Every structure is written in C-alpha cells, then in structure tokens.
Amino acid sequence: MHNVHLPQNIINRLIMKRGKVEIFDSLDPAHTALVVIDMQNAFVAQGATLEVPVARDIVPNINELTAASRETGAAVVWVRITVAKSGPNAFLVYHQNFFSPDKAARHQAALAEGTESNALYAELDI
C-alpha cells in the first residue's frame, strides 16, 4: 500500500541475524493463508467516510495474490471491521478516547453491520 524502502543497513542487520533476508524459503499452501484486512468500502471507495485513497492502488495486487493463493490451495481470509452498537464489539474505549464525538459517530456509522460502507470493495475478487 505504501512505497517502502528498507535502508541497506537494516537489510544488512537482517542478513547478520538470520543469514538471509527472507524468513521462509518456501510456503506450504496447505499451511498458508493470505489474510486481507481493511479492504472495506469505508476505507477504499472514492469519497468514503474513512477513505484511504492509496488503498485502491493495491486492489490489482490483492487480486493477483488471491488468484495465486487459490490456485495453490492456500486459504484466502477476508477480515472486516464491524462496529456494534453496544457490547465489546462497540470499541467504546477506542471511540471515546481516540476520536472527537463527531468523528467517533462517523467511524461507528461507516463500520456498522449491514451498511454498504462495511461491505468489501466491489473490485476485489472475493
């Protein structure tokens, strides 16, 4: 999603620590899952309440990864944040302490169960 460049000194430290950059030499599809998080309309759709414009840029990559994962037999898991009206899934501490009241209300409404903004972005190959 973001253009990230690891400085060479960090890469060198990884190599010193484990002898290589990559953690795994290969992945066993039977024991592997691609987990896709926060690709809901609330974050991805143009003009959405919680829009992250660069999220749309990674949709083609996600679709390629999901196709490759399915082709090899790896699981594909889609994670949606859903905010309930009450109870532990209302994220009350989060909304009361990290947002102004109006921003909290917008966040809660955008991620409410059954809303279009809570649905996964339509251009994803689900």
Annotated model-derived regions:
Residues M1-E123:
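Active-site acidic carboxylates
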